[in-house]
Amino acid sequence: MTLGQKIKELRECQGMLQKDLASRLGIGDTFLSKIETGQKLPKREYLKKLSEIFDIPLIEFETLWIASKINDIIKNEEAGQFALKHISKSNE
């Protein structure tokens, strides 16, 4: 699960509209939509707010945030693909 998927799932479970969560975070609902669909990654400072809003341990959001950043590096850089293959081979 990506960070955006987690945010969307939590928001929908609480019956919250995008505009309501965006307002609580201090961002636009268009930006929140892009976060939920994986087009954008929120600044790390928003993770604490999300943790408080959804009463979820901060580490859960931080883990997904870091995983998203690593994934972006790997998929957007040729060297990242080679590094991933190297890691896979060294773990065998």
Task: Indicate residue ranges for each PLM-predicted region.
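Short amphipathic helical patch at the helix-1/turn junction of helix-turn-helix
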Residues: 1, 12-13, 41
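Short basic helix-loop element that most often maps to the first helix and adjoining turn
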Residues: 5-24, 77, 83-86
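Conserved hydrophobic/aromatic packing and binding residues within compact polymer-binding modules
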Residues: 7, 21-22, 32-35, 61
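Recognition helix of helix-turn-helix/homeodomain-like DNA-binding domains
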Residues: 26-41
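Short, basic-rich loop-to-helix N-cap that marks the start of a DNA-contacting helix
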Residues: 39-52
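Short, charged recognition helix plus adjacent turn
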Residues: 52, 60-92
